[in-house]
Amino acid sequence: MPHPLLPDLETLASATATGKGYKLCCVQVFTHLIPMTIQVQIRRKDGSDVSLDDCAHFSASMDEALEASQLFTEAYVLEISSPGIGDQLHSDQDFLTFRGFPVEISFRDDDSDLHQAGLLHKRSDEHVHINIKGRIQRIPRKAVTCVRLTNPTG
């Protein structure tokens, strides 16, 4: 059962995040912990990575907003974090950040589903380029259904 103050907390966190150049991803309240823990996850509005400094900066602002709102009368721990990146790459920033990382590309070719594994080289307007044993293979972007990070095998 969600905490009864969760909607108010989400509204407060969203307004605080927006005012500081962030986007709210998730708010959770863990009442089974002593003291209670409030976890807020944020992303940068411009899509760039959230740093520890960003978390510290937002933590101070969120703490002030919580204290001013007087939503909680009991002690709590405030945790600010970023959800990080999932396995799948979507944005241009993802492809820049993970250049050289091992990936698996799923794509369609002549009505069959294919998979190709290699090191991410780049993504252009027309193709996704991967390095397979030192050779660059280009896969048309419109055929690509998924690009996901994998663990290197050794």
Curated annotation (Swiss-Prot):
Name the record gives this protein: Ribosome maturation factor RimP
The UniProt record lists the keyword Repeat: no
Please give the GO cellular component terms listed in this UniProt entry. Answer: cytosol
Q: What does this protein do?
A: Required for maturation of 30S ribosomal subunits.
Question: What keywords sit in the KW lines?
Answer: Cytoplasm, Ribosome biogenesis
Task: Recall the taxonomic lineage recorded for the source organism.
Answer: Bacteria, Bacillati, Cyanobacteriota, Cyanophyceae, Synechococcales
| Entries under InterPro entries matching the protein | Ribosome_maturation_RimP, RimP_N, RimP_N_sf
Question: What's an example GO BP annotation here?
Answer: translation
What organism is recorded for this protein?
Prochlorococcus marinus (strain MIT 9303)
Assigned protein family? Belongs to the RimP family.
- Record's subcellular location: Cytoplasm
Cite a single Pfam family from the UniProt record.
Answer: RimP_N
Chief place where the protein resides:
cytoplasm
